């Protein structure tokens, strides 16, 4: 295969994206199609899924291929991305069996890593009929989840016609964050019928803290006792989304 190059203009933003994916998985397969870059991966417990889609137009350089698959170990990649400086670009050069990753700024730093094949089945999009959608400030969600983590190992999301309530309780205490539909931190609010579900905080704390560095806005979709859907728009285009299974009462 001839060398193909993928270049993203904001390496720091790309580092945040990789951080947000690595909350769930240590390695994963990427797919380049002629319209964009994609990733979909399931955690080892099969209770959480991450979905990444970045359109071709978001890249400075993009491979001229119909389809290209490559797998990366995020531990090795994050070693390089820790050295990202403001204004750096990141490029990936794909050769047979390996990927040369460069940080391009005042200097060029690079590593060469193997393109691994991560074994796993094709993952369909979960079929959930959601009854509540709230678009709100992502840092509010991150703070609410962090507060919940201080007192419990699970958090409850409740959507009514008037508000979204995020709460947690245990012997350590109680926490409640209420987002009224008319709050200045709520940008869209559509509740067709009330919904509530409980979720483990195992991933939610890291997901919300890391993705709030990417996007100022989060879209939350709920249905009673169904997986929660969290979606974060990427400034350059595209989005990173999560499905997290509920805890059964």
UniProtKB/Swiss-Prot annotation:
Belongs to the PCNA family. One of its GO terms (biological process) is regulation of DNA replication. The keyword Ion transport does not apply. InterPro entries: DNA_clamp_sf, Pr_cel_nuc_antig, Pr_cel_nuc_antig_C, Pr_cel_nuc_antig_CS, Pr_cel_nuc_antig_N. Homotrimer. The subunits circularize to form a toroid; DNA passes through its center. Replication factor C (RFC) is required to load the toroid on the DNA. Disulfide bonds: none annotated. This is DNA polymerase sliding clamp 1. NCBIfam families: pcna, PRK01115.1-4. PROSITE patterns: PCNA_1 (PS01251). Keywords: DNA replication, DNA-binding. Signal peptide: none annotated. The lineage of its organism: Archaea, Thermoproteota, Thermoprotei, Thermoproteales, Thermoproteaceae. It comes from Pyrobaculum aerophilum (strain ATCC 51768 / DSM 7523 / JCM 9630 / CIP 104966 / NBRC 100827 / IM2). Sliding clamp subunit that acts as a moving platform for DNA processing. Responsible for tethering the catalytic subunit of DNA polymerase and other proteins to DNA during high-speed replication. Pfam families: PCNA_C, PCNA_N. GO terms for molecular function: DNA binding; DNA polymerase processivity factor activity. The keyword Lipoprotein does not apply.
